[in-house]
């Protein structure tokens, strides 16, 4: 990692998104810049027994997205999201047929894997949990795929005709950043010229909702779904569960230039830390997240004063938003008080491993379009969250350097720096 300044440079040349609201980067970006929220009462199952009954679900029809009958029947929603997002990224990049298959790889990220299908199929083979020994006669032949997240990378490799490095990253809520850093390392180290990388999670299921209910991490604001997610607001009381996927085509910069590809942004630096402290708790001083941000900026050769925008984790839990505020002050110094910071979780919820990939997509689009989406529902700022969290309304601004961060259960903290392609170091 210390040699990154002298290594090959990595740019994003394709983006594909499946998000609450619609499929594609255009509706995704329009929704964010309009400040529209996707939180609604959960429709995929009866959520009335649960404390939190709202979520940001994707309006996703796999058949309408061109998936085959086998893909519709056999694939978990997480896999379907990943496949469609990767397909969109490949089409956006125009790289198909222009890269050596042996120099093209795949990295997929997920926090929960195929949770929904595991939930459903266990109910089938165990007679709704009444059988101690499951009846495999009622199982499905592809049930094994639900247990191995690597099947997601395999399906995308077949789609991309990628015969190079492949793998999976599962690091909870930092998976979407961490998978991109691993993929970028493979390009920088010369193991690949092109990587298809991203993250997907579709975990709006009874077992997941019950888990977050148990630790009171999700909001019980069921009577106000559209305003339920309130990052940095005095009245915040938990996050909204979401779902989705974002995949990218990462290329070595010279390779992208040779084929005349458009580059959205350069992945200039990244770093991760763990607080080694608690599965769910965060230190109030934000030390580990601050260290990740500082290290990522150092690797990118970016001074804190040069950061134009910060994409916050912004989960709308009491402790996270205070933790982040402290981390930004610690890592950015006086500039923390003037740089715009916002959370798109206020609009699309928290899709676990996928969310920070969606946030990287939004960050790259900010550089492309020069607009900063707002933090929706931020009407009563917490006086202890006293930075510029871009309340309610998007802003036009020249953005050439972005920091995006993520915090995950287990104490994982990750940061990634995106810059305009070809920036002088």
From Swiss-Prot:
Gene3D superfamilies on file: 3.40.47.10
GO cellular component, one term: cytosol
SUPFAM superfamilies assigned: Thiolase-like
Keyword Transferase: yes
Any GO molecular function: 3-oxoacyl-[acyl-carrier-protein] synthase activity
Superkingdom of the organism of origin: Bacteria
Associated pathway: Antibiotic biosynthesis; oxytetracycline biosynthesis
Keyword Transport: no
Keywords from the named record: Acyltransferase, Antibiotic biosynthesis, Transferase
InterPro entries (alphabetical): Beta-ketoacyl_synthase (IPR000794), Ketoacyl_synth_AS (IPR018201), Ketoacyl_synth_C (IPR014031), Ketoacyl_synth_N (IPR014030), PKS_Beta-ketoAc_synthase_dom (IPR020841), Thiolase-like (IPR016039)
Catalytic residue list: 173 (for beta-ketoacyl synthase activity), 313 (for beta-ketoacyl synthase activity), 350 (for beta-ketoacyl synthase activity)
CDD domains, per database record: KAS_I_II
GO biological process terms on file: antibiotic biosynthetic process; fatty acid biosynthetic process
Domain Ketosynthase family 3 (KS3): 7-420
Cited PROSITE patterns: KS3_1 (PS00606), KS3_2 (PS52004)
Record family assignment: Belongs to the thiolase-like superfamily. Beta-ketoacyl-ACP synthases family.
Protein name per its UniProtKB record: Oxytetracycline polyketide putative beta-ketoacyl synthase 1
Species of provenance: Streptomyces rimosus
């Amino acid at each position: 990692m210390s040699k990154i300044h002298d290594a090959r440079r990595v740019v994003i040349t394709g983006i594909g998104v499946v998000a609450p609201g619609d499929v594609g980067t255009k509706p995704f970006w329009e929704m964010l810049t309009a400040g529209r929220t996707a939180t609604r009462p959960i429709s995929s199952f009866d959520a009335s027994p649960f404390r939190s009954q709202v979520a940001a679900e994707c309006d996703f029809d796999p058949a309408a997205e061109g998936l085959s009958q086998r893909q519709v029947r056999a694939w978990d929603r997480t896999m379907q999201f990943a496949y469609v997002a990767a397909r969109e990224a490949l089409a956006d990049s125009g790289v198909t047929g222009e890269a050596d298959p042996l120099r093209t790889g795949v990295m997929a990220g997920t926090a929960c894997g195929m949770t929904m299908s595991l939930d459903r199929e266990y109910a089938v083979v165990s007679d709704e949990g009444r059988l101690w020994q499951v009846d495999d006669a009622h199982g499905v032949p592809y049930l094994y795929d639900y247990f191995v997240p690597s099947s997601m990378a395999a399906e995308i490799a077949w789609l991309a005709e990628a015969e190079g490095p492949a793998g999976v990253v599962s690091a909870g809520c930092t998976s979407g950043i961490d998978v991109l850093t691993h993929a970028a390392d493979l390009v920088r180290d010369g193991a690949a010229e092109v990587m298809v990388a991203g993250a997907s999670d579709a975990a709006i299921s009874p077992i997941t909702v019950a888990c977050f209910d148990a630790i009171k991490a999700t909001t019980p604001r069921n009577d106000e779904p559209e305003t339920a997610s309130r990052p940095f607001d005095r009245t915040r009381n938990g996050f909204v569960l979401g779902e989705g996927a974002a995949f990218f085509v990462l290329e070595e910069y010279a390779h992208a230039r040779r084929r005349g590809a458009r580059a959205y942004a350069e992945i200039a630096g990244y770093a991760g830390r763990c607080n080694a402290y608690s599965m769910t708790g965060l230190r109030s001083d934000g030390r580990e997240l601050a260290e990740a941000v500082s290290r990522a900026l150092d690797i990118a050769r970016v001074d804190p004063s040069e950061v134009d925008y910060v994409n916050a984790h912004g989960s709308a839990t009491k402790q996270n938003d205070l933790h982040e505020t402290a981390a930004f002050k610690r890592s950015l110094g006086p500039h923390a008080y003037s740089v715009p910071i916002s959370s798109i979780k206020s609009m699309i919820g928290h899709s676990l491993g996928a969310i920070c990939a969606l946030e990287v997509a939004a960050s790259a689009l900010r550089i492309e379009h020069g607009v900063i989406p707002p933090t929706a529902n931020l009407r009563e700022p917490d006086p202890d969250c006293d930075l510029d969290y871009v309340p309610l309304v998007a802003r036009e601004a020249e953005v050439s350097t972005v920091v995006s961060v993520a915090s995950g259960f287990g104490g994982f903290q990750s940061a990634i720096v995106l810059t305009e392609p070809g920036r002088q170091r």
